[in-house]
């Protein structure tokens, strides 16, 4: 699955770059981030946390209405533990690829992402049975996303919202009884030059 996602991403970038109008830009906003966690076949209760994302993008217009954007985004992800005041924090670099259709500035979008977790850590106090070790986690993440953006007319400013659903099991040696998957809602603003 990883190879397929990367092949699609690079092929899309190559095709778009060959014959397209390109704009570059920046984006930033808030994350409402959580993870689906299961340990020993028991679903763990987690609490979403608010964090942020920031990054750059390149938007390719295939024609007047079909567009694609790709970029590199730092995203602070994770969740709060249900017991104690602990937070699981993932410092992640994501490469999102969005395909969009323009309706007079409103652009529904669907896409995929590949990510690399730079660091996975637990902060704060939790129950004594709860532990996280960075070496127990995969650093490669991937998933799919849905969203929309609105571009102001005759202006580079845009507003966006998206939901990213992680498909990768972030646990090393994970299975259907032991897994961790990302779930991230993003709301932000950006500017295209």
What is each stretch, according to the model?
Residues 20-59, 68:
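Short glycine/proline- and aromatic-enriched beta-strand/turn motifs that initiate or cap beta-hairpins
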Residues 1-27, 189-193:
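Bacterial Sec-dependent N-terminal signal peptides
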Residues 26-30, 52-60, 72-74, 95-101, ...:
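Residues on the lipid-exposed face of transmembrane beta-strands in outer-membrane beta-barrel proteins
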Residues 81-110:
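Helix-adjacent hinge/juxtasegments
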Residues 77-81, 133-136, 144-147, 152-193:
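Predominantly the C-terminal beta-signal and adjacent terminal strand-loop region
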Residues 36-43, 80-86, 120-128, 171-176:
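Outer-membrane beta-barrel translocator domains and adjoining extracellular loop/strand segments
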Residues 22, 46-52, 89-93, 104, ...:
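Residues that define the transmembrane beta-barrel architecture of outer-membrane proteins
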Residues 19, 63, 103-106, 152-155:
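Outer-membrane beta-barrel channels and translocator barrels
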């Amino acid at each position: 699955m990883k190879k397929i996602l990367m092949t699609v991403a690079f092929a899309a970038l190559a095709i778009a770059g060959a014959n397209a109008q390109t704009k570059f830009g920046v984006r930033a906003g808030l994350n409402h981030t959580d993870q689906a966690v299961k340990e020993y076949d028991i679903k763990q209760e987690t609490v979403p946390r608010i964090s942020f994302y920031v990054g750059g993008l390149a938007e390719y217009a295939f024609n007047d209405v079909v567009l694609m954007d790709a970029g590199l985004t730092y995203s602070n992800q994770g969740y709060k533990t249900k017991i104690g005041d602990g937070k699981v924090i993932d410092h992640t670099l994501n490469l999102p690829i969005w395909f969009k259709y323009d309706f007079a500035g409103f652009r529904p979008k669907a896409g995929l992402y590949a990510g690399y977790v730079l660091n996975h850590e637990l902060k704060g106090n939790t129950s004594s049975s709860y532990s996280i070790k960075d070496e127990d986690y995969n650093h490669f993440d991937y998933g799919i996303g849905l969203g929309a953006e609105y571009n102001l007319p005759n202006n580079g400013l845009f507003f966006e919202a998206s939901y990213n659903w992680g498909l990768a099991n972030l646990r090393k040696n994970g299975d259907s009884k032991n897994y961790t998957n990302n779930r991230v809602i993003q709301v932000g603003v950006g500017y295209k030059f």
